[in-house]
C-alpha cells in the first residue's frame, strides 16, 4: 500500500473500514492491560476512528497517526473539537485536550515519541499493509516502543487467495514471526465473523476469523 492509494481511498469516500461505533473488542480487552491513567497510547493509521474518543475517555493521552489530512480534519469536525495545530519534523499536529493526531507517516515518528508510549492500539493498521510493509512496520514501529508498553492488536485470518486485500489476512503464525524478539503477542480471542462481513461473503471467502492479541514490549 503506497501513500497515494490510501489518500485516494479517503478522497473518494471508499472507507468501508471506518466503523461508526466503538469496537466492542477494544472495550472488552483494553481494561485488562492496566495502562496507567495519563499514559500515552499510540493509534497507528488512525483514520477518524471513534476508538480514539473512547480511549481518551478512559483518562489516556491518545496519539493517533494518519496520512490523510481529510481524515484528520473530519475526526475533529465530527466530534465537535477545535484543535490547535503546529508543525514538526514528524508531521502536522492537531491537538485538542488529551487527543492528538499527527498528519504524517508513521515511519517518520521519532524514537522519543515511540519510547514514551505506554500503550498501543492497532485495529486497522497491520491488516492494511501488504506483507513487505508489515515486516518493516513491526520492526520500525513496534520495535521502538518503550519497554513494558502494552496494547491490543486485532487482525483478520482468511484464505488470502480467495480475496485481494486490503484488508489483508494476517494469521497467528505471521503475527508471532513479526513480533518475535521484541514484543510478546499472546492470542486472547478468536471468533468467526464471516456472517457479519457481507463483502467477504460476496467475494467467495469461505472462512473469516478475527484474532485479538495482548501485546507487551519486551526489554
From Swiss-Prot:
Task: Write out the residues that bind S-adenosyl-L-methionine.
Answer: 10, 45, 66, 123
Protein's UniProt keywords contain Metal-binding: no
Keyword Protein biosynthesis attached: no
Cite the entry's keywords alphabetically.
Answer: Cytoplasm, Methyltransferase, S-adenosyl-L-methionine, Transferase
Where this protein primarily resides, as one coarse class? Answer: cytoplasm
GO BP annotations of the record are: methylation; response to metal ion
Q: Which family does it belong to?
A: Belongs to the class I-like SAM-binding methyltransferase superfamily. TPMT family.
Q: What is this protein called?
A: Thiopurine S-methyltransferase
Task: Tell me the organism.
Answer: Bordetella pertussis (strain Tohama I / ATCC BAA-589 / NCTC 13251)
Amino acid at each position: 500500500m503506497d501513500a497515494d492509494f490510501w489518500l485516494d481511498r479517503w478522497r473518494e469516500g471508499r472507507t468501508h473500514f471506518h466503523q461508526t461505533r466503538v469496537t466492542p473488542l477494544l472495550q472488552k480487552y483494553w481494561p485488562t492491560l492496566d495502562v496507567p491513567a495519563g499514559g500515552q497510547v499510540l493509534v497507528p493509521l488512525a483514520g477518524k476512528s471513534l476508538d480514539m474518543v473512547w480511549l481518551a475517555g478512559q483518562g489516556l493521552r491518545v496519539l493517533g497517526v494518519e496520512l490523510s489530512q481529510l481524515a484528520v480534519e473530519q475526526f475533529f469536525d465530527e466530534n465537535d473539537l477545535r484543535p490547535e495545530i503546529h508543525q514538526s519534523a514528524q508531521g502536522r499536529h492537531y491537538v485538542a485536550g488529551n487527543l492528538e493526531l499527527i498528519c504524517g507517516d508513521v515511519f517518520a515518528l521519532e524514537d522519543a515519541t515511540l519510547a514514551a508510549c505506554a500503550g498501543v492500539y492497532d485495529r486497522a493498521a497491520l491488516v492494511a499493509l501488504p506483507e513487505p510493509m508489515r515486516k518493516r512496520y513491526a520492526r520500525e514501529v513496534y520495535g521502538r516502543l518503550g519497554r513494558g508498553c502494552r496494547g491490543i492488536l486485532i487482525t483478520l485470518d482468511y484464505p488470502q487467495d480467495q480475496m485481494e486485500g486490503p484488508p489483508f489476512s494476517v494469521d497467528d503464525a505471521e503475527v508471532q514471526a513479526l513480533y518475535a524478539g521484541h514484543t510478546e503477542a499472546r492470542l486472547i480471542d478468536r471468533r468467526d465473523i464471516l456472517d457479519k462481513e457481507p463483502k467477504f461473503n460476496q467475494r467467495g471467502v469461505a472462512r473469516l476469523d478475527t484474532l485479538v492479541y495482548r501485546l507487551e514490549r519486551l526489554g
